Amino acid sequence: MNVYNKADSFSLESDSIKDVIHDYICWLSMTDETRPSIGNVFTAMETFKIDAVRYYDGNIYDLAKDINTMSFDSFIRSLQNITSKKDKLTVYGTMGLLSIVVDINKGRDVSNIKFAAGIIILMEYIFDDTDLSHLKIALYRRIQRCYPIDDDDDR
């Protein structure tokens, strides 16, 4: 899987935010030994954890612990529980929450497919095109803040 290269070449104009999120969730769920170096897109994705803590009205870590990753069915049921809290989490907070869930479950047998499928189901279920568009623009801005592109290099 060439996640690092794909993530570093993120383009606001052409890349699907769903593909970027899918790759990020797969990257998160890899073991530390197999995970490629973090790319600038994934560094920006990590900042959504701050949004999850900031905007959720309650302890986001308690909510993350309630998300059951032991089986695919229980994981999907847990995601449905998240959808009932959409107004409290926001699209950014939901992305951060899923990152926190992976952090909590590190070392357990959590498959890439489970998280990738779960996040895609979640996106189809509660995020509309406007939410995803806002997420894509926010991600792009966070990348630009950390890794500004100097247009003068071409001269």
From Swiss-Prot:
Alphabetical keyword list: Early protein, Host-virus interaction, Inhibition of host innate immune response by virus, Inhibition of host interferon signaling pathway by virus, Inhibition of host TBK1 by virus, Inhibition of host TLR pathway by virus, Interferon antiviral system evasion, Viral immunoevasion
Entry similarity comment: Belongs to the orthopoxvirus OPG029 family.
Quaternary context: Interacts with host TANK, TBKBP1 and AZI2; these interactions prevent interferon production. Interacts with host STAT2.
Annotated function: Prevents establishment of cellular antiviral state by blocking virus-induced phosphorylation and activation of interferon regulatory factors 3/IRF3 and 7/IRF7, transcription factors critical for the induction of interferons alpha and beta. This blockage is produced through the inhibition of host TBK1, by binding host TBK1 adapter proteins TBKBP1 and AZI2, thereby producing a strong inhibition of the phosphorylation and activation of IRF3 and IRF7. Also acts as an inhibitor of the cellular response to type I IFN by interacting with host STAT2.
Superkingdom of the organism of origin: Viruses
Keyword Hydrolase listed: no
Protein name: IFN signaling evasion protein OPG029
Lineage: Viruses, Varidnaviria, Bamfordvirae, Nucleocytoviricota, Pokkesviricetes
GO biological process terms, semicolon-separated: symbiont-mediated suppression of host cytoplasmic pattern recognition receptor signaling pathway via inhibition of TBK1 activity; symbiont-mediated suppression of host toll-like receptor signaling pathway; symbiont-mediated suppression of host type I interferon-mediated signaling pathway
InterPro entries the record matches: Poxvirus_Bcl-2-like, Poxvirus_sf
Induction of its expression: Expressed in the early phase of the viral replicative cycle.
Nucleotidyltransferase listed as a keyword: no
